[in-house]
Structure formats: structure tokens, C-alpha cells
A protein has these predicted regions:
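ABC ATP-binding cassette signature C-motif
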Residues: 1-264, 308, 314-556
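Intracellular alpha-helical coupling/juxtamembrane segments of multi-pass membrane proteins
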Residues: 251-284, 288-294, 298-305
Length: 556
């Protein structure tokens, strides 16, 4: 198998209504063991490509075929699991062959005691079973399951799938898929619903994975550290590049340096981020160059043809005074679990606080308390007199699938009043990369990334001076992520951002709020990498390993 391609596509095309070629004439061959990052704007056909490779979407032009006999594993954005199974039952489906081999091996050993047994036949079967077990490290199976469950912070083994959140189900599906160890992994946004430490673990796992990995992801550190190839989908074409994210952008810089069409807004965007790039430690020089190259791309005339605007607009709220948010001795529990235990911190003016920690640790609960939707068990939250919160409701879930994008944001109004500003509603919606006919798309037809942008457009209408953003980076393409970073940095107010995107947190965060075990929350001045370095020095490398969260129990 090492000398052959594991998967081949020949002149593959895909037409979607109304007669739009989302993919056209793609011919690619995939090497065994290759790690491929798939990039492209939202709606470019990335998920469609993976569905074709997984054999789910067969209505295509051309030919797509895996090498005979290889095992392909696919993680869709919304995986299907048996709702009646427990977490352990769902995970053990991945290792069913090994479990059956272990059970049968015990039976074979017992059969050797029978004097009439066919010992040659038993020995042959024993050899086959031991080969299966050895190939999957089967004698260490329980440890494997526990390590994977800890790394991806799975819910309790006995929890029923039907009671899990969408994010928890997705983590269970990812864990099951990784334990199956297929020859080829097809991963659609695998880092969504993972916290930053679990993303770092997944990055290391896939870096060392022996099989082929094809991953759609917006995680730029992941693309830099794991990908050996970048496959860019641009207006239907698949353009492969051998190298990681940084080298891909370097080669684009050489071509795009000759482009003349540059727009002042994009030039300003480059300058803003280059200020950060130049302040980076020497160890990040390659990434710094990569960022420069990406912004050169955004300025090219070619780019403007495919994406008319690449700015996000955060309307300035009222002027923010010196006192922003002060939290003193905050405690909050649910049932017998303490989520937050004696938390105190003060947010200075212009701060951008990145909030990290395991799912279910209480990050969103803090937002609900800050906005007054829930009360703490004890302690105080004091907002400055000038503070106006733009708080996160679940707009992604609450949006009306039958409305158009423009209607969902504008409610039919031609002019929107946001804080002290008035802006034409179509121009405002256009600031979120919904152009022309895209504003007439039904909400129910949007991709995950498009829903994310629409969610931002609705949230930012609030016009506050302290933004509370709950996982705003989910499903966004890297271009929109860059625009969001710049918009937050240029906003004159404060922001608190729950995120697992390490590059995003490095770029924007002035402080980190980290949810640990037993309700302990750490407030640190610095960005994500600064915090990780401090944590490693203070508590040792083991402190950076993800594990199932431990809750402090309330004594009855």
C-alpha cells in the first residue's frame, strides 16, 4: 500500500441548484500517511468534497474512488449516534473487533484443555486473533479508552447519548472514530466543541497518526503544525500545495506581490495585524511571514472578485469609563456540582479576556450572571456605570429558517439604528460578507459558517461597549476570522470571548480566564501562549494535558 495512492479523484464535479458548479474538474491523488488541510471560503464546497470522498454523495461528475480494501472514517459536522446507547457503548463500537477477538481468545485458550481438540486449527485461530489484538494494542484496551475519553473530555461513561448536547455528541463521535484507526480520516471541522487543551492534544495525535488525514479546519496553528499539504478550494477548483499553512501563504505572496489592485481598507487591515506580527518572539517568524502573505492575498484583485468585502463592523457603543467589571468572591453551583468557587477578578479598560476551559465547566454560566440572567450563590458582580453589555443569546438556534438573511437582521427596516449610528440595513448586512443575492438566501439554507456570520451580525446590532462572545469562531473561515480579530482589536470597548481557537486567543487576548477542576478559575494577564508557558513553569508539563473535568461536590 505504501507505493500506491490511497484515494484518487478524476475530473470530479458537483452541480448544486440552481445549476451552480460548486466543484469542477478536480483531479487529485492522495498519498498514504499524508496530512491535508482543506481551505476555502464558507460555501466553497469543502464539506461537499468530504461527503464525496466518504462515498455519501454519489451524484457527481467524474470519478472518485478509494484504493480497494482501505477503511475510511468520516466525521461530519452533525454525526449520528444511537440515542439509546451510553457513552461507553458508543465508544466500544469502535473497538468491537478487538473486544470480540479478546473474548474469542479466552475461549480458544479454554479449548486447549480438551484432549480431543484440533490443536493445529486452534493454533492457527490463536495466531489470527493475536494479530488482530496486537495490531490494535488490544491488551491495553481499557487504558486506551480512558486516555482518549480524558483527552477529549467526554461525559461520564454511563451518560445516555440522548441526553447529551450537540457538542458532547460530537466529541463522542470523534473519539469513536479515532479509536477505529481507519486508513483514511475525513474530518469536517474536528476542533469545533473542543477546548484549547483538547485541540492541542488532537493536533499531536493527528501529527503522529499513521494513516491519511484530510481535515477541514479553521485552526491556523493546526494547519501550520500538522498539515503537509494544503488543498485550497477556490471558485470550484481544487488547488493542492505541498507544504504547511505558512509555506502555502509564502508561495502565494510571490504571485500576489505582482497584483496592483489594492484597497485601502485591506491595506489598513494588514498594517494592524503586522504590528502584532512584528512584536512576536523570534520563534514565530515563520508564522509572522505567513500572516503577511495572507493579507497580500486579501488585497489581490482576484480575491476581491470572489469576496467583495472582508471587514466586520462592530458599531461603537457609549464611551466606556475607567471602571468596567469587578467580580468579588463569586460562587455558583448546579445541583451538587460547584462550577465557580470563590472567583475574583477586575477587568481594566480596553481589556480583551479570552475564556478557556472544558465544556460544561461554567464558562457560559458566567456570561449569564454578568448579564443578570442568573444570580450567583454568593459574591458580587459590579458593572461600571457606563457599561452596556452586548450579551450572547443563542441566535444560531433561535433564527427563523424561513426568513432571508436580510430579513433576519433588518426585520424589514431599510435603516438600522445601532447605538448613536444609523446605517442602511443592506450595507450593514454586507459588512458580514453577505453580498447581493446572498442577502436573499433563506436562513435554513445557510452553511454553518454563514450562520456564524449571521449570528455575529445580529449580536453586534446591540451596540454595547462590553462584548460577551460565546465561541464566535465556530465554523468561520480563516478570512472571516481575521476580520473578526481586527474588528475586536479596533473596537474602543472591552470584550470577553469564550474560544478554543489558540491563534485567535494569541492575537487578541490581553487576559486569560481559565476554568480548571473543582470550580477553580485562574485570571491571568497575557495571551494564551503566555498563559500556557506560565502554567507549564508553575505546575509542570502534566498541567497542559486535557482530562475529564473534576467537579467539587457540595457536602449535604
Amino acid at each position: 500500500m505504501s507505493t500506491q495512492f490511497v484515494y484518487t479523484m478524476h475530473r470530479v464535479g458537483k452541480v448544486v441548484p440552481p445549476k451552480r458548479h460548486i466543484l469542477k474538474d478536480i483531479s487529485l491523488s492522495f498519498f498514504p500517511g499524508a496530512k491535508i488541510g482543506v481551505l476555502g471560503l464558507n460555501g466553497a464546497g469543502k464539506s461537499t468534497l468530504l461527503r464525496i470522498m466518504a462515498g455519501i454523495d454519489k451524484e457527481i461528475e467524474g470519478e472518485a474512488r478509494p484504493q480497494p480494501g482501505i477503511k475510511i472514517g468520516y466525521l461530519p459536522q452533525e454525526p449520528k449516534l444511537d440515542p439509546q446507547h451510553t457513552v461507553r457503548e458508543a465508544i466500544e463500537e469502535a473497538v468491537g473487533e478487538v473486544k470480540r477477538a479478546l473474548t474469542r481468545l479466552d475461549e480458544v485458550y479454554a479449548l486447549y484443555a480438551d484432549p480431543d481438540a484440533d490443536f493445529d486449527k486452534l493454533a492457527a485461530e490463536q495466531a489470527e486473533l493475536e494479530a488482530v489484538i496486537q495490531a490494535h494494542d488490544g491488551h491495553n484496551l481499557d487504558n486506551q479508552l480512558e486516555r482518549a475519553a480524558d483527552a477529549l473530555r467526554l461525559p461520564d461513561w454511563d451518560a445516555k447519548i440522548e441526553h447529551l448536547s450537540g457538542g458532547e455528541r460530537r466529541r463522542v463521535a470523534l473519539c469513536r472514530l479515532l479509536l477505529e484507526k481507519p486508513d483514511m480520516l475525513l474530518l469536517d471541522e474536528p476542533t469545533n466543541h473542543l477546548d484549547a487543551e483538547s485541540v492541542a492534544w488532537l493536533e499531536r495525535f493527528l501529527h503522529d497518526y499513521e494513516g491519511t488525514v484530510v481535515a477541514i479546519t479553521h485552526d491556523r496553528y493546526f494547519l501550520d503544525n500538522v498539515a503537509g499539504w494544503i488543498l485550497e478550494l477556490d471558485r470550484g477548483e481544487g488547488i493542492p500545495w505541498e507544504g504547511n499553512y505558512s509555506s502555502w501563504l509564502e508561495q502565494k505572496e510571490k504571485r500576489l506581490a505582482q497584483e496592483q489592485a489594492q484597497e485601502s481598507a485591506r491595506q489598513k487591515s494588514i498594517e494592524k495585524e503586522l504590528e502584532w506580527v512584528r512584536q512576536n518572539p523570534k520563534g514565530r517568524q515563520a508564522k509572522s511571514k505567513a500572516r503577511m502573505a495572507r493579507f497580500e492575498e486579501l488585497n489581490s484583485g482576484e480575491y476581491q472578485k470572489r469576496n467583495e468585502t472582508n471587514e466586520l463592523f462592530i458599531p461603537p457603543g457609549p464611551r466606556l469609563g475607567d471602571k468596567v467589571i469587578e467580580v468579588q468572591h463569586l460562587t455558583k453551583s448546579y445541583g451538587d456540582r460547584t462550577l465557580i468557587d470563590d472567583l475574583s477578578f477586575s477587568i481594566p479598560k480596553r481589556a480583551i479576556v479570552g475564556i478557556i476551559g472544558a465544556n460544561g465547566a461554567g464558562k457560559s454560566t458566567l456570561f449569564r450572571m454578568l448579564s443578570g440572567k442568573e444570580q450567583p450563590d454568593s459574591g458580587t458582580i459590579t458593572l461600571g456605570e457606563t457599561v452596556v453589555l452586548a450579551s450572547v443569546d443563542q441566535f444560531r438556534d433561535a433564527m427563523d429558517d424561513k426568513k432571508t438573511v436580510w430579513e433576519e437582521v433588518s426585520n424589514g427596516q431599510d435603516i438600522l439604528t445601532i447605538g448613536n449610528f444609523e446605517i442602511p440595513s443592506r450595507a450593514y448586512v454586507g459588512r458580514f460578507n453577505f453580498k447581493g443575492v446572498d442577502q436573499q438566501k433563506r436562513v435554513g439554507e445557510l452553511s454553518g459558517g454563514e450562520r456564524g456570520r449571521l449570528h455575529l451580525a445580529k449580536l453586534l446590532q446591540a451596540g454595547g461597549n462590553v462584548l460577551l462572545l460565546d465561541e464566535p469562531t465556530n465554523d468561520l473561515d480563516v478570512e472571516t476570522l481575521r476580520a473578526l480579530e481586527n474588528a475586536i482589536l479596533e473596537s474602543p470597548g472591552c470584550a470577553m470571548v469564550i474560544s478554543h481557537d489558540r491563534w485567535f486567543l494569541d492575537r487578541i487576548a490581553t487576559h486569560i480566564l481559565d476554568y480548571g477542576d473543582e470550580g477553580k478559575v485562574t485570571f491571568y494577564e497575557g495571551n494564551f501562549s503566555d498563559y500556557e508557558e506560565w502554567k507549564k513553569k508553575t505546575f509542570g508539563a502534566e498541567a497542559l494535558q486535557p482530562h475529564r473535568i473534576k467537579y467539587k461536590r457540595i457536602a449535604k
